[in-house]
Amino acid sequence: MYAENYKRLEQLIDKLREFNGVILVEGMRDEVALRKLGVETEIIKLSRFPLAEIALTASHYHDIMILTDFDRKGEDLAKKLTQYLEGYKCRVDTNTRRELKKIAKKDIKGIEDLYGLYLRFKSLRF
């Protein structure tokens, strides 16, 4: 089970590293975790501006990935952002978040813990 999750997590991290759009996260710690994983693309933090303003800024990118936390607040933010962005006819990836949640739901609560989970899985040496 852990070996499968680790392999899938590595695939998703590779996807994040190769992503050429903008990633929307809740806060600074989320961005730091993604940077530690080698993600170099543009990242916008939701905690800085109203959602409508963030959606407008993000709509200038061709591809947008929403990576909010896995709690109720994160779910609500992801839904609202998706609605705003679909109004701008943007291509929005919420599947990556859903996949990460499926793999890590018992181990972490959100994106800021992703780097730690990756290190734990890696240390198990499958």
From Swiss-Prot:
<keyword id="KW-0460">Magnesium</keyword>
<dbReference type="GO" id="GO:0046872">
    <property type="term" value="F:metal ion binding"/>
</dbReference>
<feature type="binding site">
    <location>
        <position position="71"/>
    </location>
    <ligand>
        <name>Mg(2+) 2</name>
    </ligand>
</feature>
<feature type="domain" description="Toprim">
    <location>
        <begin position="20"/>
        <end position="100"/>
    </location>
</feature>
<dbReference type="InterPro" id="IPR022972">
    <property type="entry name" value="UPF0292"/>
</dbReference>
<dbReference type="InterPro" id="IPR034141">
    <property type="entry name" value="TOPRIM_RNase_M5-like"/>
</dbReference>
<dbReference type="InterPro" id="IPR006171">
    <property type="entry name" value="TOPRIM_dom"/>
</dbReference>
<feature type="binding site">
    <location>
        <position position="26"/>
    </location>
    <ligand>
        <name>Mg(2+) 1</name>
    </ligand>
</feature>
<feature type="binding site">
    <location>
        <position position="69"/>
    </location>
    <ligand>
        <name>Mg(2+) 2</name>
    </ligand>
</feature>
<comment type="similarity">
    <text>Belongs to the UPF0292 family.</text>
</comment>
<feature type="binding site">
    <location>
        <position position="69"/>
    </location>
    <ligand>
        <name>Mg(2+) 1</name>
    </ligand>
</feature>
<protein>
    <recommendedName>
        <fullName>UPF0292 protein TSIB_0423</fullName>
    </recommendedName>
</protein>
<dbReference type="Pfam" id="PF01751">
    <property type="entry name" value="Toprim"/>
</dbReference>
<keyword id="KW-0479">Metal-binding</keyword>
